[in-house]
Amino acid sequence: MASDLRPPEHQVAGHRASADKLGPLVDGEGLFYKPLQAGERGEHEAAFYAAFTAHPAVPPRVRGAFFPRFHGTRFLPAPASPGGAPYPHIVLDDLLAGLPSPCVADVKIGACTWPPRSPDPYVAKCLAKDRETTSALLGFRVSGVRVVDARGGAVWRPDRSELKGIDAAGVRRVLRRYVSTGGGDGLDCALAAAVYGGEGGVLAQLRELKAWFEEQTLYHFYSASILFGYDANAAAAAAPGGGSGGVRVKLVDFAHVDDGDGVIDHNFLGGLCSLIKFIGDIVAEVTEKASSDHS
């Protein structure tokens, strides 16, 4: 099995695995292996997954629909680890397995990305990044994106420095480009109805997730991300009415989750509402244009 492990081809955020750097791996059989982060963060994330998976107050629908399935931890050969010793990895479902031409977006949620009781240097580092990106302004930032053009197979994948410098208008362009085919100005939003709209689309799933966050007081999800995934060919072939059924919306990255202590996670909820507004505006715009084209 170890010989089949490789860095995910479609990774858009985080550290990429190499001979001298630890990073996530996939096995081609539907599993994703995430090396434990250094210090307490990795152990904290593994403990969160174990507790969350068994928590009786988490609705099974929420756990199954919006969180990766947890398969425990496993030591894997890791040349990049100290002394080349086997290194512990969290084992999860590969969220993009089964998508031949995956289009991915990683959106970090929350205007504040550090948990309470964080050391001052870490707070300063997070605060600087939140202010120089759209996190502080919008309550979320796009950390990575990859779009495959279903017609020709060309891949659009802006680098991190490009995403880091965008403003609210830039976020709107990226979210539009994520559901465009690349024709014309590259912002035709031709796949918006299939990906963002409809019963199984991103917008409907985000609204369902929002309903849970309006009630849940178990956890506060600092620096967690929402991952969108869809297959370019399936979306292009979907009916224009929207909702191809293959769109995936998942929460990831839980190294900084804190106890909710009976309080709503307003930081995450606020960012989620902001993201819903941006995507809802795109769906409304596309719907209005389709109506005017047929009138």
UniProtKB/Swiss-Prot annotation:
It is an enzyme of class 2 (transferase). It catalyses: 1D-myo-inositol 1,4,5-trisphosphate + 2 ATP = 1D-myo-inositol 1,3,4,5,6-pentakisphosphate + 2 ADP + 2 H(+); 1D-myo-inositol 1,3,4,6-tetrakisphosphate + ATP = 1D-myo-inositol 1,3,4,5,6-pentakisphosphate + ADP + H(+). GO terms for biological process: inositol phosphate biosynthetic process. GO terms for cellular component: cytoplasm; nucleus. Highly expressed in anthers and at lower levels in roots, leaves, flowers and embryos. The keyword S-adenosyl-L-methionine does not apply. The keyword Oxidoreductase does not apply. Its EC number is 2.7.1.140, 2.7.1.151. InterPro entries: IPK (IPR005522), IPK_sf (IPR038286). It comes from the Eukaryota. Residues 1-21 are annotated as: Disordered. Keywords: ATP-binding, Kinase, Nucleotide-binding, Transferase. GO terms for molecular function: ATP binding; inositol tetrakisphosphate kinase activity; inositol-1,3,4,6-tetrakisphosphate 5-kinase activity; inositol-1,4,5-trisphosphate 3-kinase activity. Belongs to the inositol phosphokinase (IPK) family. Inositol phosphate kinase with a broad substrate specificity. This is Inositol polyphosphate multikinase IPK2. It comes from Oryza sativa subsp. japonica.
